[in-house]
Amino acid sequence: MSNETKCPFNHTAGSGTTNKDWWPNQLNLNVLHRHSALSDPMDPDFDYAEAFKKLDLAAVKQDLHALMTTSQDWWPADFGHYGGLFVRMAWHSAGTYRTADGRGGAGGGQQRFAPLNSWPDNVSLDKARRLLWPIKQKYGRNISWADLLILTGNVALESMGFKTFGYAGGRADTWEPDDVYWGSEKIWLELSGGPNSRYTGKRELESPLAAVQMGLIYVNPEGPDGNPDPVAAAHDIRETFARMAMNDEETVALIAGGHTFGKTHGAGPASNVGPEPEAAGLEEQGLGWKSTFGTGKGKDTITSGLEVTWTSTPTKWSNDFFKHLFSYEWELTKSPAGAHQWVAKDAGEVIPDAYDASKKHRPTMLTTDLSLRFDPAYEKISRRFYENPAEFADAFARAWFKLTHRDMGPRARYLGPEVPAEHLLWQDPIPAVDHPLIDAADVAALKAKVLATGLSVSQLVSTAWASAATFRGSDKRGGANGARIRLAPQKDWEVNQPAALATVLETLEGVQKAFNDAQTDGKKVSLADLIVLAGAAGVEQAAKNAGIAISVPFAPGRMDASQEETDVDAMAVLEPVADGFRNYLKSAYKTPAEALLVDKAQLLTLTAPEMTVLVGGLRVLGANVGDSKHGVFTDRPGTLSNDFFANLLDMGTEWKPVSAANDVFEGRDRATGAVKWTGTRVDLIFGSHSQLRALAEVYGSADAQEKFVRDFVAAWNKVMNLDRFDLA
């Protein structure tokens, strides 16, 4: 080989055997550093909300309407209309959302990235997004991919004669894949029952998952594991849709409404289909699933392997889905690709062909469509919708809006002229500010009043944390605004220590009432604001106890929600099963406590340094649930010291597990053997894990006390304001 052809690098940065390969159980902190400015190409001062406000939404919609019926030779439109394809694209963008952790959903435009862009359930959606590129290119930064995908779904419905409930923009794009747990299977569409199965017992789906197989959005349309049993499929439908916050009525409306349009594609065997986008060659330029069956497109398209058109008007809103569902008896058959589907017995050919106007077909359905007839609860709803088309249309409009906006959080984030006026319970509504807000003098006076009540630093800090730390950056739910900590179900959560919480809230309500009653100009302080303000007072007092004067930032403007404005069932999913910041585990889990801490920190949008400083601070402030002494490595609780780190890193202490599960440890004096401290896995990980130990060493150093307090206050303030979208 000549010198010119020898490459000096056999491997490049990031290749080779990784730490994860060597130590697969190592705690992964990478999830805390996703979506930073380092991966974002936009200017530091770019504000997507402001950019969207300058968008001519009507012009974008006009262009989208034109696109719907402008069929492209490289990817022809079924029935001459892209509506069905774009409805599916929007549905699959939003439909990854799950209630358990709020992850997934349309926000961020994650359908552009792996693994979602290459899921088997998303075959051909690469083409849908590519059809949209000229419009995205035209409007540039003023509309994100995330917003455009959902807007296109809405316009598709409108262009086919359906009146939508509304549309809100405000979904800023992300620029790299989310790190989401989608399951443990190693094979796409792996069946249940294997070593990596997501099911246990009597088909009990693993939490937080909300799909039946790896690479699907919800259910297998052929039935559970491909078994064409509509009744069994109903179980899967109900479970997966419920995990996306949909009840039975919304589920029926979505399935029937979505399947009023378009068709599925199974013109030939799947063996003709090439690799998915992430595995395709460079020359494919991000497209995948290139097919060698016939022309590979149009009438020869292979997507799901099913070949079903539900209605006689697949580009027009109608009640045909229910008409066909109930008018015929159905017999099992197979698509040209060999997939299980159903055909109407003794039916005429009333279904148009997607590409040949001279052809007609008999009505066809999926196994999961028939579930809407043969499951008793679904059947009642389906018949009601069949007999009341206007009710069905309204139900679908509302369910579609919920599907496509569920992960956006409160209405404060909604942008654009088509935001519906109606406030919906699932949006966790909070009253608008209707009174003058407290000023700096009031803040100082209220802090003094709070500290004079006799409530401890621990009580003040714990209550404020419990109120604010319900926030999830995934779906923007939770947080201190609304003061829902005083309402069901939050007031009764074990992690919030209901009896102790009630005492603190009663005391703070007394301070609130006294202040509000004394005002003559209508000025008020909400309990939501006062809870956060009281926490700030506690932190300032704890810093003062450490000899450091610092002011915790505070911005009034929170309001108090009512019980009637709170969906108890929907709010229940925010209950922490673990909160390592308070050294809390609801029960024993397979997932280590330290991994649950990182997961919680990621939902709180914290970095590893922020997580570290908060744990160390909350321990010495006595914020543990049940006043547990685990991790309270200080002899001066209530003082915002760096003792947690200094004592954890002390080589004079030897740690040993004292529980069978290796989840509780004793730290003994190496010289005397006397027990000095006790701690959990969440505590000891900051001395064990090399990256976290490096951070702990920063805060455990002799010169770190002031920096520790300053960093704690900054991280604390961040958490207190995570849901303050009005401050952005």
Curated annotation (Swiss-Prot):
Annotated keywords: Heme, Hydrogen peroxide, Iron, Metal-binding, Oxidoreductase, Peroxidase
Residue positions of the active site: 92
Catalysed reactions listed for this entry: H2O2 + AH2 = A + 2 H2O; 2 H2O2 = O2 + 2 H2O
Any Pfam family: peroxidase
A molecular function GO annotation: heme binding
GO process annotations (BP): cellular response to hydrogen peroxide; hydrogen peroxide catabolic process
GO cellular component, one term: cytosol
Entry cofactors: heme b
EC numbers, comma separated: 1.11.1.21
Swiss-Prot/TrEMBL site (Transition state stabilizer) positions: 88
Matching InterPro entries: Catalase_peroxidase, Haem_peroxidase, Haem_peroxidase_sf, Peroxidases_AS, Peroxidases_heam-ligand_BS
PROSITE patterns recorded: PEROXIDASE_1, PEROXIDASE_2, PEROXIDASE_4
PTM info: Formation of the three residue Trp-Tyr-Met cross-link is important for the catalase, but not the peroxidase activity of the enzyme.
Primary enzyme class: oxidoreductase
Cross-link Tryptophyl-tyrosyl-methioninium (Tyr-Met) (with W-91): where in chain: 218-244
SUPFAM superfamilies with a match to the protein in the record: Heme-dependent peroxidases (SSF48113)
Record-linked CDD domains: catalase_peroxidase_1, catalase_peroxidase_2
Disulfide-linked positions: none
List of residues binding heme b: 259
Positions of crosslink type Tryptophyl-tyrosyl-methioninium (Trp-Tyr) (with M-244): 91-218
Assembly: Homodimer or homotetramer.
Family note: Belongs to the peroxidase family. Peroxidase/catalase subfamily.
PANTHER family registered for this protein in UniProt: CATALASE-PEROXIDASE (PTHR30555:SF0), HYDROPEROXIDASE I, BIFUNCTIONAL CATALASE-PEROXIDASE (PTHR30555)
Purpose of the protein: Bifunctional enzyme with both catalase and broad-spectrum peroxidase activity.
The name this protein goes by in its record: Catalase-peroxidase 1
Gene that specifies this protein: katG1
